[in-house]
From Swiss-Prot:
Compositionally skewed regions (Pro residues) per UniProt: 10-22
Name of the protein in question: RNA polymerase sigma-F factor
Positions of short motif Polymerase core binding: 101-114
Family from the record: Belongs to the sigma-70 factor family. SigB subfamily.
The keyword DNA-binding is annotated on this UniProt entry: yes
Species of the source: Kitasatospora aureofaciens (Streptomyces aureofaciens)
Composition-biased stretches (Basic and acidic residues): 23-33
Top-level taxon of the source organism: Bacteria
Function: Sigma factors are initiation factors that promote the attachment of RNA polymerase to specific initiation sites and are then released. This sigma factor is required for normal spore maturation.
Amino acid sequence: MTVPASTAPQVPPQQDPQVPHPQEPREEPHEEPPSPPAAPRPQSRGADTRALTQVLFGQLKGLQPGTREHERVRGALIEANLPLVRYAAARFRSRNEPMEDVVQVGTIGLINAIDRFDPERGVQFPTFAMPTVVGEIKRYFRDNVRTVHVPRRLHELWVQVNAATEDLTTLHGRTPTTPEIAERLRISEDEVLSCIEAGRSYHATSLEAAQEGDGMPGLLDRLGYEDPELAGVEHRDLVRHLLVQLPEREQRILLLRYYNNLTQSQISAELGVSQMHVSRLLARSFARLRSANRIEA
């Protein structure tokens, strides 16, 4: 049997399954990474160091020296004030010495200043410590640093020559000769002599030290000295130049008084005038000489 098309069950049209569209990823709000804290300004660091130093000295005052806590606080004071040492050491950069060595020496001065500082005197610690630190560094250069620059190779060779000299002195019971040192180190005698000469530049020679050779005077004995008569020669030459400007009688009175060492009474007898008149003539001569000297000057 044929079913009319109108009455045939209608098959619903198949619909394509809807595929869900992928959702657009949400943009998270962009957050800037936190900026690092600004470095403290030098003035701020200095103020912090001063404040910390003041607190540490307050703690140190109530502690027994030699105890573990005392050493801890003392070490913190040293650490906090090392920038002061570096600042002082930087003033000596031109000395061609390793800066680490200079800082170590300055640290000794810092420790001495810490041990001597009294907070109750009302003085800031940097003000108190700086002269001690600088003084320690200057003492180091004065006592340990050579006065003349020595090439590095010659300096290293000098150390070897010095060690060989000590060994040979112990071995032979006497100071070794230059050839013995040269043979020991396998270097030339000229190099040994150069090293010995370079070694002398490490320390200044005392003016009172005896020189090589028997009976040789020290440097101080060979230095010239100022002859006390030189000033007298200069004065006499000046007076002679001014004296010719005086009247002849006044010239004679001055010569009798100061060159012949006569008294005023002796001069009055020599010239046949009163002692009072001699005194007035001397005073007048001095006034004229002073006036002439001012004009010459």
